């Protein structure tokens, strides 16, 4: 069974990180760090489709499953990243149940969906096994998506709802904020968690680090990103530079 699906089925929160920098070396570092999963970001990161096979191999070298955030609800792209060996797909800007259904259909082979069979890196012995194992998260990032929460959550084939706090805040008319701490954003996240639980699904989101993650776990979030390769690199540089400056 997909390790992500197994952990979530057991009711445990899971923690991962974003792989934003293109190339297998940073992906390998994250894959070997002991996270429950790694998300390769092909929407806002520097990762393009041509980078994915070696990056997926690098993450999986550490025994870690990889999820790919695709650029949009584009069935051919969704199918392709799964052919490349992704354990799951994160689809941005899903606003309606129809869009969620289109994404779900692209992740499953007939009779459950429209996924075309490709053997690029497939390790599955049957299409039924692949359909049961894949994990699909759809991102809730707009006021429209909040209005359609229950319908999106109830969509067959959708496994989780993932809050995109920055875009969601902007859609709600809030100033740019990376913490998700504004009261309307907190309320929106709690609404997503409740909708996911009503549908027997799980909720996920981006965190500002371990302390923020602990708060979100208490509020019912079970799929949480702790950071990104770029952020870890930036923090390490700043720390060492500050230490060096103190010696001058």
What are these regions (language model features)?
Residues 1-20, 126-132, 190-198:
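N-terminal amphipathic alpha-helix/helix-capping segment at the start of soluble metabolic enzymes
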Residues 19-33, 72-80, 143-155, 208-214:
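Short, acidic/polar
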Residues 76, 86-176:
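Conserved anion-binding
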Residues 13-18, 38-40, 66-69, 89-91, ...:
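Hydrophobic faces of well-ordered beta-strands that scaffold small-molecule active sites
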Residues 49-83, 107-112, 130-131, 181-203, ...:
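Alpha-helix-loop-beta-strand connector modules within alpha/beta enzyme cores
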Residues 74, 115-124, 134, 140-144, ...:
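C-terminal alpha-helical cap/extension of soluble enzyme domains
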Residues 26-54, 163-181:
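Glycine-rich, proline-tolerant flexible connector loops at the mouths of alpha/beta enzymes
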Residues 26, 31, 35, 60-102, ...:
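Active-site beta->alpha loop and helix N-cap motifs at the rims of alpha/beta catalytic domains
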């Amino acid at each position: 069974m997909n390790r992500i699906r197994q952990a979530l089925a057991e009711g445990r929160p899971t923690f991962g990180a974003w792989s934003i920098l293109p190339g297998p070396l940073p992906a390998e570092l994250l894959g070997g760090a002991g996270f429950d999963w790694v998300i390769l970001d092909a929407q806002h990161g520097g990762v393009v489709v041509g980078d994915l096979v070696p990056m997926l191999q690098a993450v999986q070298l550490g025994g870690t499953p990889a999820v790919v955030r695709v650029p949009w609800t584009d069935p051919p792209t969704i199918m392709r990243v799964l052919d490349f060996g992704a354990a799951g797909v994160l689809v941005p800007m899903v606003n309606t149940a129809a869009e969620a259904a289109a994404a779900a259909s692209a992740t499953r082979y007939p009779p459950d969906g429209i996924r075309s069979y490709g053997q690029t890196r497939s390790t599955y012995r049957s299409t039924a096994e692949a359909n049961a194992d894949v994990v699909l998260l759809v991102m809730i990032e707009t006021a429209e998506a909040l209005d359609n929460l229950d319908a999106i959550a109830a969509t067959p084939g959708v496994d989780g709802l993932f809050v995109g706090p920055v875009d969601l805040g902007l859609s709600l008319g809030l100033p740019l904020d990376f913490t998700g701490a504004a009261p309307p954003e907190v309320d929106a996240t709690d609404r997503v968690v409740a909708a996911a639980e009503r549908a027997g699904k799980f909720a996920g989101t981006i965190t500002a680090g371990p302390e923020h993650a602990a708060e979100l776990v208490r509020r019912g979030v079970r799929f949480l990103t702790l950071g990104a390769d770029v952020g870890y690199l930036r923090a390490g540089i700043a720390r060492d530079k500050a230490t060096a400056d103190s010696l001058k």
